[in-house]
UniProtKB/Swiss-Prot annotation:
The gene is hemE. The record marks 71 as: Transition state stabilizer. This is Uroporphyrinogen decarboxylase. InterPro entries: UROD/MetE-like_sf (IPR038071), Uroporphyrinogen_deCO2ase_HemE (IPR006361), Uroporphyrinogen_deCOase (IPR000257). Its EC number is 4.1.1.37. Catalyzes the decarboxylation of four acetate groups of uroporphyrinogen-III to yield coproporphyrinogen-III. Its main location: cytoplasm. Belongs to the uroporphyrinogen decarboxylase family. Keywords: Cytoplasm, Decarboxylase, Lyase, Porphyrin biosynthesis. It is found in: Cytoplasm. One of its GO terms (molecular function) is uroporphyrinogen decarboxylase activity. The lineage of its organism: Bacteria, Pseudomonadati, Campylobacterota, Epsilonproteobacteria, Campylobacterales. Pathway: Porphyrin-containing compound metabolism; protoporphyrin-IX biosynthesis; coproporphyrinogen-III from 5-aminolevulinate: step 4/4. It comes from Helicobacter pylori (strain G27). GO terms for biological process: protoporphyrinogen IX biosynthetic process from glutamate.
């Protein structure tokens, strides 16, 4: 698999490409599958439809890897927090974590309840071309914790940060509990058939450096270290969004570092490129315009050259991006990097 070879810095015929949120609303086929499911959460839980959606971008765009269609919040959902997705607003937990008692009441072994995810993986792997990789994923302990404490997405993360500074032992207990669940969750994804795993730390930028390293990065390192010990042949990709200023403190046992669009690739390559393969980092809105897209691709490829790079966006696909430009991006990267 070209994608897996690239994760391990092996020679590849061209630079592989996939896109975060490549299965999404910009595809009419996705909209149809979502309609059949009835709701976003039901789409995640319906393995047949989730498989359909996982495969769509591979078939339509020609990307080099599929990423499992699911949501990072299925883990806290199965730990006992009721979850709903409110149209135009996003996820909302009906209960939140407020004290040590609420952390202790969270179910242990929630990963055992996620058979619909593992079924999607095994179905997808059976239908996916042998040349294409399947990526599994989860959210980081910190990012999941913020949703569980705030109850929804937040601009200030005030409740989470208040807990971090005034009652750190409660937050640590939650992060520890989540980390143990996520290690087993990703292990079962690997056993079900994924070829690589990725951890999304979407709200990494909410924390100052010292707090980030202690309350997020340390837990990411713990998870990736255990996974590399169990499955050395499976690449681990970490994507801490918005921490370009902290790159000099990044270390750990993982293979690929995801670079967001706000972090210059030149800096990421200089600081991390010798140790980790870099993934990223085209600004997604460049896909609105072909000229802007071409300029962005040119800049990235000039910096990264032929090895140690997986092409991706620096954030997820937007719902109204033209699909023909997404397809063009894949063709362009393949053509420009063919060796």
């Amino acid at each position: 698999m070209i994608f897996i070879d690239a994760c391990f810095r092996k020679e590849t015929p061209y630079t592989p490409i996939w896109m975060m949120r490549q299965a999404g609303r910009y595809l009419s086929e996705y909209q149809e599958s979502r309609k059949k499911a009835g709701s976003f959460l039901e789409l995640c839980k319906n393995s047949d439809l989730a498989t359909e959606v996982t495969l769509q971008p591979v078939e339509i765009l020609g990307v080099d890897a599929a990423i499992l269609f699911s949501d990072i919040l299925v883990v806290p959902l199965e730990m006992g927090l009721n979850l709903e997705f409110i149209p135009k607003k996003g996820p909302h937990f009906l209960e939140t974590i407020t004290d040590l008692k609420s952390v202790e009441s969270l179910k242990v072994g929630a990963y055992k309840q996620l058979n619909y995810v593992y079924d999607t993986i095994s179905q997808t792997r059976q239908k996916l071309s042998k040349e294409k990789a399947l990526i599994g994923f989860c959210g980081s302990p910190w990012t999941l914790a913020t949703y569980m404490i705030e109850g929804e997405g937040s601009k200030s993360y005030a409740k989470s940060k208040k807990m971090l500074y005034s009652e750190p032992e409660i937050l640590k207990a939650l992060l520890e509990k989540l980390s143990l669940e996520l290690i087993e969750y990703l292990s079962l994804q690997i056993q079900a058939g994924v070829n690589a795993v990725m951890i999304f730390d979407s709200w990494a930028s909410a924390l100052e450096k010292e707090a980030y390293l202690k309350f997020s990065w340390d837990y990411l390192k713990k998870i990736s270290k255990e996974l590399k010990k169990r499955y050395p042949h499976i690449p681990v990709i970490l994507f801490p969004k918005g921490i370009g200023a902290y790159l000099d403190s990044i270390d750990g046992e993982f293979d690929v570092f995801g670079v967001d669009w706000g972090t210059p690739l030149t800096a990421a390559k200089k600081i991390l490129g010798g140790k980790y393969v870099l993934q990223g980092n085209l600004e997604p809105t460049r896909l609105y315009d072909k000229n802007a897209l071409e300029e962005g691709v040119e800049t990235i490829l000039k910096v990264m050259g032929n090895q140690g790079h997986i092409f991706n966006l620096g954030h997820g696909m937007l719902p109204d991006l033209p699909r023909e430009n997404a397809k063009y991006l894949v063709q362009l990267v393949h053509a420009k990097t063919r060796r």
